[in-house]
Amino acid sequence: MIPTSDITGLILAGGRGSRMGGVDKGLQTFRGAPMAMHTLMRLSPQVGHMLINANRNLAAYESFGVPVVADSVPDFAGPLAGILAGLEQCQTRYLLTAPCDSPFVPTDLAAKLSQAMEEANARIAMPVTMEPDAQGQPRRQVQPVFCLIDALLADDLIVYLQGGGRKIETWTARHATVDVLFDDSTAFANINTLEELHQLAERR
């Protein structure tokens, strides 16, 4: 398994929050603390170093005690721009990402992804969960914003973004990628509206 010291964790908090009315999702209070702080507390014990990707309210994120990196690609280019910012700044061979609005990040995320990456000789590892479709039948759901990435792929990601690419799964398909099954799909629940925020706080 990849040593913890070889992995940098990256919290993706650089989006517009448009589905939540433009608010900064990572700074919304969830059970008494900002959502991004919940993600930080669950992710940081799994890695050797931490970064936060943010494009506004930088001082608020810096108060978490973790280096903050902004997108180098302009105009809120999506999560891949945040991932690139992390790849450009991390000093380790691997980068582990998680969005700021996922307060139940699995505590074994790094361990399971790194083990699968090594066993498959892959460059990227992503979680997969089984979730019901419209007919109630189980289907595979890839969780692409939670991923372990070989930092040597940074140059290829630059090329992809410069060519106008924005979809995570389209970029990861260019490389050897392994999917890793996780049983608890709610661990990857992200929060896109204030209503979902309140519902999740009450439910779990």
Curated annotation (Swiss-Prot):
InterPro entries: MobA-like_NTP_Trfase, Molybde_CF_guanTrfase, Nucleotide-diphossugar_trans. Signal peptide: none annotated. One of its GO terms (cellular component) is cytoplasm. It catalyses: Mo-molybdopterin + GTP + H(+) = Mo-molybdopterin guanine dinucleotide + diphosphate. Mg(2+) binds at residue 101. Transmembrane segments: none annotated. GO terms for biological process: bis(molybdopterin guanine dinucleotide)molybdenum biosynthetic process. CDD domains: MobA. Its EC number is 2.7.7.77. Transfers a GMP moiety from GTP to Mo-molybdopterin (Mo-MPT) cofactor (Moco or molybdenum cofactor) to form Mo-molybdopterin guanine dinucleotide (Mo-MGD) cofactor. This is Molybdenum cofactor guanylyltransferase. The lineage of its organism: Bacteria, Pseudomonadati, Pseudomonadota, Betaproteobacteria, Burkholderiales. The gene is mobA.
